[in-house]
Amino acid sequence: MKKLFLAMAVVLLSACSTFGPKDIKCEAYYMQDHVKYKANVFDRKGDMFLVSPIMAYGSFWAPVSYFTEGNTCEGVF
């Protein structure tokens, strides 16, 4: 039973690392409901950033125009 649990944990960890964003390329700030948030940026396609908010779970695609000054992504993509 212990080996089965360990095997399941390894599979889950590798699935998370396989399907989750890989490398943080830069950080960006965005406004939502008049509050400025900081997010890790993983990728860019056209005018969209793949971001994951710091202090939150999950990631999403957001337009570059959604972000405010202070991001560190200039020259990265």
Curated annotation (Swiss-Prot):
Q: Where is the lipid attached (S-diacylglycerol cysteine)?
A: 16
Q: How does it sit in the membrane?
A: Lipid-anchor
Signal peptide, first to last residue: 1-15
Listed A to Z, the keywords are: Early protein, Host cell outer membrane, Host membrane, Host-virus interaction, Lipoprotein, Membrane, Palmitate, Signal, Superinfection exclusion
* Localization (cell): Host cell outer membrane
| Triggers of expression | Expressed early during infection.
Q: Which GO terms describe its cellular component?
A: host cell plasma membrane; membrane
GO biological process: what's one of them? superinfection exclusion
Query: Where are the N-palmitoyl cysteine lipid anchors?
Result: 16
Question: Where this protein primarily resides, as one coarse class?
Answer: host cell
Q: What does this protein do?
A: Inhibits of the adsorption of T5 to its FhuA receptor. By this means, T5 within cells excludes superinfection by T5 and other phages using FhuA receptor as a ligand.
Q: What is this protein called?
A: Lytic conversion lipoprotein
Biological source species: Escherichia phage T5 (Enterobacteria phage T5)
